[in-house]
Amino acid sequence: MKEYKVYLERARSRQQHFLYPLIFREYIYGLAYSHNLNRSIFVENIGYDKKYSLLIVKRLITRMYQQNHLIIWANDSNKNPFWGYKNNYYSQIISEGFAIVVEIPFFLQLSSSLEEEEIIKSYKNLRSIHSIFPFLEDKLTYLNYVSDIRIPYPIHLEILVQILRYWVKDAPFFHFLRLFLWNWNSFITTKKSISTFSKSHRRFFLFLYNFYVCEYESIFVFLRNKSSHLRLKSFSVFFERIFFYAKREHLVKVFAKDFSYTLTFFKDPNIHYVRYQGKCILASKNAPFLMNKWKHFFIHLWQCFFDVWSQPRMININPLSEHSFQLLGYFSNVRLNRSVVRSQMLQNTFLIEIVIKKLDIIVPIIPLIRSLAKAKFCNVLGQPISKPVWADSSDFDIIDRFLGICRNLSHYYNGSSKKKSLYRIKYILRLSCIKTLACKHKSTVRAFLKRSGSEEFLQEFFTEEEEILAFLFPRDSSTLQRLHRNRIWYLDILFSNDLVHDE
């Protein structure tokens, strides 16, 4: 039972009081503003960032000190200057600042756990989105079945609050949290769906949602590691975290005594689990009936413990060689490369067919063009168009914006097996930039290029990444040629591009 007590200590260590004084500090909201400003570096900075000012924050903190604004007028949204519909901006500010405050102790807990596991040196590389793909390249080629699962969202915010209660024993924190959510549900909008809240309070919602994912994964990993002692159909008795460990100790004794000969759930050493955002990939080498067990495990886990409805038909188990899945803006599938080898032994000749599996990762050109069309860089057919909303900026700013988007897309999609789709995206952005400059100067594209000679200038910028590679390696070297053909994964990408379309 010592290992179970160690696992329990992880939950107890998070039962601490939060740093409430930080909620009343101006620099916390400055951090929230800076986070959102740096987060949207790919397209345009959209949201309340442009409205941010310390004067508004000071006014907000003053109203937070005056508790009568939160309580006395709780039944009249027109009189309530803090929670009223017209002042929804205050709600956004406080949710961002509050999310930063509550993230602090959990980040410290994460750092301490990484130090204990002695992986703190590689933590920065593990944070990179691209670190997932080398793992898939190493593992998926040896597996046979894959299940592409979308993690369902809770339909009510109270479910997320209840999940948080298992980890944090702090009554004032939950009073404030429920007050905030209740006022949002009552006054700010008539739409009670969780999707509306996630759009208007993005960082706060991500904090609650990440807790939900962390809770279900902690149960999944714990049961996965101890699965040789458990029957899958009996897992539902563990879901009351307060009595989790006592029940498990009792069940191990019961299984050892009465059910040792009927254990139907055993370890699968070749099962792999990968998750990012709201999607997870489950892959296995063995027969699909084990995958079916895990499928029903997830369904019952979400339905019985988290009150989240999920249908079995939404989780499909497919042969890896016949199925492609979308992850982090890429289409991935395992391609079979067949070759025939002629072998001769004495006077007998044999033809041996060799099958080599290779993970094929490509850029989904149609969804990406759809995202570019939504951002007004091209039409739905992929034909570049000008962006008049940027015409008020200087030529240098316009070019810098387009080049920033192009570089980031090229940086993100350099792991593609086929680069032709990436070259087409670069062409769309390049021509859209030229059309925007021509629109600003009230000229045609041909006349603008002839007059300013911008074609060579843009060409130099759009090939900057290739120039860097050529600087590191000689132009006639085989290494440079392989880098142009092969995939390159960058371990400094911490979040996906805003134009990346991930279903």
UniProtKB/Swiss-Prot annotation:
Main location class: plastid
Pfam entry (one): MatK_N
Superkingdom: Eukaryota
GO cellular component, one term: chloroplast
GO molecular function: RNA binding
Chain's role: Usually encoded in the trnK tRNA gene intron. Probably assists in splicing its own and other chloroplast group II introns.
Family listed: Belongs to the intron maturase 2 family. MatK subfamily.
Protein name: Maturase K
Organism: Vicia faba
Gene for this chain: matK
